[in-house]
């Protein structure tokens, strides 16, 4: 089913809501076009409390997909979490179906936006950029949904322009879905600037670096290793670099750093995130005592112990602390706080935070993600471990204070790929990469059984179920994923 209308907010810009649009009076000029693109193309890609794809709460893409793997766990037992934590997906499960139910209709909103801005009398260069941003957003959202659910519904412009007619849009084929994603991202990459610096007026908007990063992830999903390498090389031309100290990536003072490919800009009263509120125990001592602490998210002890003790990335994970009650809590004396694992602190404190809401930017994609994907894609495309693949892995590995790998350290391709998977887990936990990585390696279900003790995980759960409401309302014309 398709739902027509525009709703959104984005980045650090004024947000507007367009539930219905009189196209004879809006949009008519460049400002209207910009507002429409901000609402439609950027609306999904935000982190604001309980809103947006990248929120830190129960509706967040990164937190929920990582929670279904060996990386994260949650102490809360309300109705939302068990299906994810135990990989017990059904067509009526809240979290597994929510991303499709919430965001699938935004594909159509972006298609309508492309049509509505095409005829506006404005500077051609600006119009071309806005079209590219909208196509980047559509391709990105389509990729996210495709990764989670497989082929998606793609309504035509004709259907979208006749919202009063009930038209059931079936799921597109795999080939049609991939083509939409690929075409949109390639078109965007041809137009958008490589990157923006924090001082740029358009900082926070989509870039060539983002378009190629998402396209690289699509090709990794499709096992098109050579094409993934090509995309990685394009990102490497965009001017990104690794931040020297891992912990500095995630701080208020270092927002907009050169490692960041895309982040959700958080600003007091506009968009605010709740990671620390979801992680910290009530008795955890913070420099700012006004941060709310709900004692939820954890890093399982088995994953914590997979780090080398010398790994500097452990600096943003807390395995022991002296509580405000004077008691020392750790793995052997967990109390009610560390029984499910260490504290995945990740982000720096917001010194002016007075509630659950922080204005530290939420990381979405960064250069370390691309470099480690490059290492994997290079090895897979050559069917052998190459020096270049080892070098890309070392770019990230040595930043963590660990000794560089040598080519001779790896006795086989599988040995190297295992090292890459481990590195990506240690580097990118909490950033939403693990589920896709494990599926690509054929380990997602195995890990759910081995590390989460799941008795319900099945191979078909590599894809999440579409909401049952979508199937019911379509009278069966929209086909559910196998197994559900």
Where do the protein language model's features map onto the residues?
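Flexible, polar/acidic helix-loop-strand segments at domain edges
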Residues: 76-77, 81, 85-87, 305-366
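TPR-repeat structural position
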Residues: 225, 384-386
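Acidic, glycine-rich segments characteristic of secretory precursors and extracytoplasmic regions
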Residues: 10-63, 112, 175, 477-484
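Long, intrinsically disordered, low-complexity segments
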Residues: 9-12, 30, 41, 93, ...
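Conserved, well-structured interaction surfaces
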Residues: 34, 42-47, 74-149, 172-176, ...
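Short, surface-exposed recognition loops and adjoining beta-strand edges that mediate ligand/DNA contacts
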Residues: 24, 51-74, 152-157, 193-214, ...
């Amino acid at each position: 089913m398709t739902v027509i209308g525009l709703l959104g907010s984005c980045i650090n810009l004024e947000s507007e809501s367009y539930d219905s649009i009189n196209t004879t009076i809006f949009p008519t000029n460049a400002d209207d076009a910009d507002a429409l693109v901000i609402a439609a193309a950027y609306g999904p890609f935000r982190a604001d409390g309980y809103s947006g794809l990248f929120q830190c709460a129960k509706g967040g893409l990164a937190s929920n997909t990582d929670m279904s793997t060996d990386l994260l766990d949650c102490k809360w037992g309300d109705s939302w979490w068990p299906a994810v934590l135990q990989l017990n997906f059904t067509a009526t499960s809240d979290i597994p179906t929510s991303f499709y139910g919430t965001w699938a209709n935004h594909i159509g909103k972006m298609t309508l936006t492309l049509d509505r801005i095409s005829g506006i009398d404005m500077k051609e260069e600006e119009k071309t950029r806005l079209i590219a941003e909208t196509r980047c957003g559509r391709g990105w959202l389509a990729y996210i949904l495709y990764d989670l659910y497989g082929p998606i519904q793609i309504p035509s412009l004709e259907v979208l322009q006749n919202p009063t007619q009930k038209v059931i849009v079936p799921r597109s084929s795999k080939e049609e879905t991939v083509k939409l994603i690929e075409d949109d991202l390639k078109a965007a990459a041809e137009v958008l600037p490589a990157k923006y610096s924090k001082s740029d007026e358009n900082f926070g908007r989509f870039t060539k670096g983002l378009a190629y990063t998402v396209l690289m992830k699509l090709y990794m999903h499709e096992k098109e290793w050579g094409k993934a390498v090509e995309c990685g090389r394009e990102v490497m031309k965009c001017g990104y670099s690794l931040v020297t100290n891992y912990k500095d990536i995630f701080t208020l003072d270092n927002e907009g750093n050169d490692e960041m490919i895309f982040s959700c800009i958080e600003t007091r009263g506009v968009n605010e995130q709740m990671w620390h509120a979801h992680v910290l125990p009530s008795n955890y001592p913070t420099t700012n005592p006004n941060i709310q602490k709900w004692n939820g998210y954890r890093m399982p002890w088995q994953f914590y112990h997979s780090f080398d003790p010398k790994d500097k990335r452990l600096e943003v994970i807390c395995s022991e602390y002296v509580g405000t009650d004077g008691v020392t809590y750790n793995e052997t004396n967990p109390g009610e706080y560390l029984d499910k694992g260490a504290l995945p602190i990740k982000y720096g404190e917001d010194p002016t935070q007075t509630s659950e809401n922080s204005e530290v930017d939420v990381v979405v994609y960064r250069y370390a993600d691309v470099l480690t994907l490059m290492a994997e894609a290079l090895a897979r495309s050559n069917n052998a471990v190459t020096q270049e693949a080892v070098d890309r892995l070392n770019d990230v590995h040595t930043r963590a204070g660990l000794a560089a790998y040598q080519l001779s350290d790896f006795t086989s391709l599988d040995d190297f790929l295992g090292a890459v998977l481990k590195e990506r887990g240690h580097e990118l936990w909490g950033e939403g990469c693990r589920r896709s990585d494990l599926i690509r390696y054929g380990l997602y279900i195995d890990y759910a059984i081995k590390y989460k003790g799941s008795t319900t995980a099945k191979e078909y759960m590599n894809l999440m179920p579409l909401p049952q409401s979508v199937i019911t309302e379509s009278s069966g014309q929209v086909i559910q994923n196998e197994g559900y």
